[in-house]
């Protein structure tokens, strides 16, 4: 059994739900397929989103799902295993969550809003604390951990920039060079770190010290322990764009990873195939991802409208 839609949105995060909201309000028959693995699930709260500052991510998504339902958008919890482009897009699902148990849905336009995955450095204890007292973004978490003892785990020379940035939220900052050699720091780096009062510690980090479910320190491979309450890291952002590449979308290398080539609206090099949110480029914050989804949704409605008008001429 197959189902036909005007638009299928793959991914039910901020970008996907925003695109679906616009399309639903434009009276487009839209399906959202969500696998239920949001990037910010480890975080207790999301920050910096006007009117939603401090809201738990799960609550934010629940509100978004309720909003799109008001406009007739269908949402199913399933996983896309494949998609093929012919006269339209045929999207095959893993669990058969479509009405009637169908596993294949068709659409004229396809939006991929599958986001990205944070790949943490291989240090014992990081994953368990990530989103709590191991964090990556001062704009997302800085206020909540302000004035505590910060550590910054260096994995590239760009970690110097991160260490300097977080001094806005605490004056007690230690940069653990970890896998970055002292010789990789420039004279300008060293002068800026000194001016900011950042303590620089050479040596590789072995693991974290945790007491009573709170980070209390960072342990180096030589057994030295430095008391720290918060550790900033720079995960490798891995875009979840396999579906786009399988459908033939061209990609480009960026400082933040390999992303699809898109125009200002999110349209890829494949007609009818769109990318939104962190699948379209490094959006980072939830509000930016939502904005890209909104923009793609509005553009898709226009594409469909004028395609129908041209066909009627």
Predicted region positions:
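Residue-level detector of alpha-helix initiation sites
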Residues: 13-14, 118, 157-158, 280-281
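A conserved FAD-binding loop/helix module that cradles the flavin
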Residues: 20-21, 160-164, 276-313
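FAD-site-proximal beta/loop scaffold in flavoenzymes
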Residues: 128-144, 237-287, 295
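Active-site glycine-rich loop that binds ribose-phosphate moieties when present
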Residues: 132-139, 152-163, 183-187
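FAD-binding core/adjacent interface of flavoenzyme oxidoreductases
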Residues: 1-7, 75-148, 230, 256-264
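A Rossmann-like FAD-binding core segment of flavoenzymes
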Residues: 62, 68-107, 170-258, 305-313
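N-terminal glycine-rich dinucleotide-binding loop that anchors FAD/FMN and/or NAD(P) in oxidoreductases
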Residues: 25, 29, 35-37, 44-71, ...
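Beta1-alpha1 glycine-rich phosphate/pyrophosphate-binding loop at the start
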Residues: 5-59, 149, 158-183, 253
